[in-house]
């Protein structure tokens, strides 16, 4: 799991919760500190804050510095080389002087790696430097076992040091195939072990739903076992309905690319599933199992919808129904007494996002105001 932290605002409550959730679920964790090219960024202060909030596993691997002319550069502590970026392209530069910090960072990283293996610990205390292979293997083992939380930095907007982040995500984070198994349950509530292999019957978890105005509903899947292929019938463990898979897709940003299939351990997307919702498990009929579904918070703020353009009332209902497929925390109802259309969400910001999505995705403009007779409003029912 990658936790993102701003180089200006530091460790937010959301970042802290994400880290704790990853730890609770035994997930390997990596941190990326962005916006390090900005004038008021303070990486080393944030690093100390992370050590307090995330614990002693925090281990910096790439740190920012500046050249004499103020150009931001990034020091790779693995290779002990520095790089600047022009148009997203990496250019090696002379290692800048960051004082006593440099040697301290190298020693801290070496000590963290040494703690992953007895032989490495002996080598560390003997004053012998680690080989590149030992550094990579020790770091990988430490990340997998939760002993090391590598910290990288850069600028996401200006494409600085992202190459080092992506390379090390590939090298250091464990593959899903490294997990012994994932527990699901069958129709009788009995535990079933799912292994990350294409040899087992297919089981895929719907982790996200997107309302696409062009292709319709797009369901994002993580394939736990087996392989999702075009034309394959899969059973929805929640409803018992059979979904026929259209073309599996690989999603790269906004681009959707046709794929031959989505194998165990991979994620992808499928369009136009009928019954599938976020949290559902789609399985081969020979082994119907269910992954634990998330528990979503209930709406806490309800507001009346006003139509900006006459005649859009009908469009609002259908557009909101589409948005509710991708956002289970959103609700919609018609108040029979006041004849108002009411939407419910988690707060003002949430409803503002819904308002913007209605306009951008479906061309429907609405206004929001306080509803009438809130005391008589019944519990919302989802479409």
Locate each region found by the language model.
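Structural and coupling elements of P-loop NTPases
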Residues: 1-375, 379
């Amino acid at each position: 799991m990658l936790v993102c932290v701003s180089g200006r605002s530091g460790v937010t409550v959301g970042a802290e919760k994400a880290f704790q959730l990853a730890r609770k679920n035994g997930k390997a964790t990596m941190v990326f500190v962005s916006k390090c090219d900005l004038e008021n960024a303070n990486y080393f202060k944030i690093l100390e804050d992370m050590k307090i909030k995330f614990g002693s596993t925090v281990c910096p691997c790439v740190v920012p510095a500046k050249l004499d002319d103020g150009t931001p550069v990034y020091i790779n502590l693995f290779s002990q080389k520095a790089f600047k970026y022009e148009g997203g392209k990496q250019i090696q530069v002379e290692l800048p002087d960051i004082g006593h910090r440099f040697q301290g960072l190298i020693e801290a990283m070496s000590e963290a790696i040494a703690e992953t293996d007895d032989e490495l610990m002996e080598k560390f205390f003997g004053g012998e430097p680690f080989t590149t292979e030992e550094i990579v293997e020790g770091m990988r083992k430490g990340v997998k076992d939760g002993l090391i939380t590598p910290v990288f930095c850069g600028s996401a907007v200006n494409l600085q040091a992202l190459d080092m982040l992506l390379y090390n995500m590939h090298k250091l984070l464990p593959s899903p195939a490294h997990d012994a198994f994932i527990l699901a349950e069958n129709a009788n509530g009995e535990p079933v072990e799912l292994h990350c292999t294409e040899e087992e019957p297919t089981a895929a978890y719907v982790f996200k739903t997107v309302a696409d105005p062009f292709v319709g509903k797009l369901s994002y899947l993580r394939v736990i076992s087996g392989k999702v292929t075009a034309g394959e019938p899969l059973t929805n463990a929640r409803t018992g309905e059979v979904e026929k898979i259209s073309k599996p897709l690989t999603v790269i940003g906004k681009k959707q690319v046709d794929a031959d299939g989505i194998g165990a351990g991979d994620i992808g997307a499928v369009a136009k599933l009928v019954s599938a919702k976020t949290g559902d498990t789609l399985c081969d009929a020979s082994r119907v199992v269910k992954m634990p579904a998330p528990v979503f918070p209930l709406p806490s703020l309800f507001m009346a919808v006003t139509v900006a353009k006459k005649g859009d009332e009908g469009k609002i209902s259908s557009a909101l129904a589409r948005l509710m497929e991708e956002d289970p925390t959103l609700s919609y109802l018609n108040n029979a007494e006041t004849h108002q259309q009411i939407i419910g969400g988690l707060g003002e910001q949430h409803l503002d996002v819904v308002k913007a999505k209605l306009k951008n995705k479906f061309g429907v403009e609405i206004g929001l105001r306080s509803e009438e007779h809130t005391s008589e409003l019944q519990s919302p029912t989802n479409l």
